C-alpha cells in the first residue's frame, strides 16, 4: 500500500515538472518546445538508474521500529558502503548525512511547488486568492498526516482515475489538432537546435532547464524513490527494480508528454510570456474553454495530496537516520513541511523551484557516486532473476 501511494504521488510531480519547463528572466527566454526536447532526451534512458536504485535499497534495508515494516534508501546503503570500506561500525558517515540533509531540503522545496501550483490554478479557475488556498491546503494536509492510512487508500483509487482522465483528455486534444502535430515537432527541434539559440547561449540554458525539470519529474538517479520503495515486500529485489524502471517510462514519456502536447498545441502568441500553471491553464482554456481550466485545478488539487504524502514518506527514513527513532523529530519535520506548504502558496514562482532544484541536485550527486560501487550487486541480482525465470 505504501509503494502504491508513492507511485500515485509521482503522477502529480510529472505535471508539476513539465509545466515548469518554461522559465524566464531578463537575459534569456527558454521556450517549451526546446526544453521539452532536452527533457525527453534526458528522460528516455533513466530506467537503468531506477533499477540500480531498487536493488541496493532492497538489499540494504532494516526494520522500522516507529512505523513498522522496513525502511531504507540511499542514506542507508551509502552508510553500509562506507562501513564496508572502513571495515568498522560508525553511527554516522558524512556522505550519508549529506544525502539525508539534501533530501530534507529538496522535499521542503517540493512542498512549496505543490502549493504554488495549486494556488495559481485555483486563482485562475475560481478567482480564489493564493493566501486562502494555502490555508486550505495546510489544514487539509494536516488532517491527512494525522489520518494517513485511510486517506492513502482513497488516493490510491482517486489518483489513477484522474491520471487516466488526464491521458484521454490529452488524446482528445491531439485528435482535434492532428494536423498541427508535424509543425509542433518542427518547432521542438528548431528551437532546441536553432543557430539563433546556439549563438545566444540559449542551447546550454535549454539543456540545463530540461535536465532539471526531467530530474524533478521522474526522480531517476536522485535517490528519493528508494526511500519509500524499501518498505515494499517482495521475494526478489529485481522485481521491484524492473517495475520501477517501467514506471519511470510511463510517468515521464506518457504523463509529461501529455502536459507538453497540451501546451505546444496552443498558439505560440497566446502562451508567450507565461509559465507554470498560468501556461498550462491558458493552453487548456484554448482547447476546452473554462472546463479545461477547472479540470486542471481540480486534478492538481488531488495530485497535490498524493505528492505531499509521498514526500513525507520519503522523509521518514532520512529523519530517522539523522536524529534516531524519536517521534518528536518525525513530527517536527511534518510541521516544517506544512509551514513550507503554506509559504509556497504565496511565494514567487521561481523561488519555490530554485529550492527544490538545489536539494535534488545535491541528492543526485551523492547518490550517483554511491551507485557505481553498488552496480555489481544490481547486475548480479538481475542475472540471477533472469536465470530463475528460465528454469
Stretch-by-stretch model annotation:
Residues 95, 103, 116-122, 126-176, ...:
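Membrane-interface loop-to-helix entry segments
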Residues 80, 85-97, 234-249, 325-334:
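Membrane-interface alpha-helices at helix entry/exit sites of multi-pass transporters
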Residues 58-70, 79-116, 120-144, 298-309, ...:
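Helix-loop-helix module between adjacent transmembrane segments
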Amino acid at each position: 500500500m505504501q509503494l502504491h501511494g508513492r507511485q500515485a504521488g509521482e503522477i502529480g510531480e510529472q505535471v508539476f515538472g513539465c509545466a515548469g519547463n518554461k522559465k524566464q528572466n531578463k537575459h534569456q527566454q527558454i521556450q517549451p518546445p526546446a526544453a521539452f526536447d532536452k527533457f525527453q532526451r534526458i528522460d528516455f534512458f533513466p530506467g537503468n538508474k531506477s533499477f540500480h536504485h531498487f536493488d541496493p535499497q532492497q538489499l540494504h534495508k532494516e526494520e522500522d521500529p516507529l512505523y513498522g515494516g522496513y525502511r531504507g534508501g540511499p542514506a542507508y546503503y551509502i552508510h553500509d558502503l562506507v562501513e564496508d570500506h572502513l571495515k568498522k561500525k560508525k553511527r554516522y558517515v558524512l556522505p550519508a548525512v549529506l544525502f539525508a540533509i539534501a533530501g530534507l531540503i529538496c522535499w521542503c522545496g517540493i512542498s512549496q511547488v505543490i502549493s504554488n501550483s495549486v494556488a495559481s490554478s485555483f486563482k485562475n479557475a475560481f478567482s480564489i486568492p493564493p493566501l486562502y488556498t494555502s490555508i486550505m491546503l495546510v489544514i487539509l494536509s494536516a488532517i491527512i498526516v494525522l489520518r494517513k492510512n485511510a486517506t492513502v487508500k482513497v488516493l490510491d483509487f482517486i489518483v489513477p482515475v484522474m491520471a487516466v482522465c488526464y491521458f484521454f483528455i490529452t488524446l482528445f486534444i491531439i485528435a482535434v489538432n492532428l494536423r498541427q502535430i508535424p509543425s509542433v515537432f518542427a518547432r521542438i527541434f528548431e528551437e532546441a537546435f536553432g543557430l539563433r539559440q546556439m549563438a545566444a547561449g540559449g542551447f546550454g540554458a535549454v539543456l540545463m532547464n530540461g535536465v532539471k525539470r526531467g530530474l524533478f519529474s521522474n526522480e531517476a538517479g536522485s535517490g528519493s524513490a528508494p526511500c519509500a520503495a524499501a518498505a515494499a515486500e517482495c521475494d526478489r529485489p529485481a522485481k521491484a527494480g524492473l517495475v520501477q524502471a517501467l514506471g519511470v517510462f510511463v510517468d515521464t514519456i506518457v504523463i509529461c508528454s501529455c502536459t507538453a502536447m497540451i501546451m505546444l498545441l496552443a498558439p505560440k502568441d497566446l502562451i508567450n510570456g507565461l509559465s507554470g500553471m498560468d501556461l498550462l491553464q491558458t493552453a487548456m482554456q484554448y482547447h476546452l474553454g473554462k472546463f479545461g481550466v477547472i479540470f486542471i485545478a481540480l486534478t492538481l488539487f488531488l495530485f497535490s495530496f498524493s505528492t505531499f504524502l509521498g514526500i513525507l514518506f520519503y522523509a521518514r527514513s532520512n529523519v530517522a537516520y539523522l536524529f534516531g527513532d524519536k517521534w518528536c523529530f518525525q513530527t517536527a519535520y511534518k510541521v516544517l513541511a506544512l509551514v513550507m506548504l503554506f509559504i509556497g502558496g504565496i511565494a514567487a514562482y521561481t523561488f519555490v523551484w530554485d529550492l527544490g532544484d538545489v536539494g535534488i541536485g545535491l541528492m543526485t550527486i551523492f547518490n550517483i557516486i554511491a551507485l557505481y560501487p553498488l552496480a555489481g550487486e544490481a547486475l548480479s541480482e538481475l542475472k540471477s532473476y533472469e536465470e530463475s525465470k528460465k528454469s
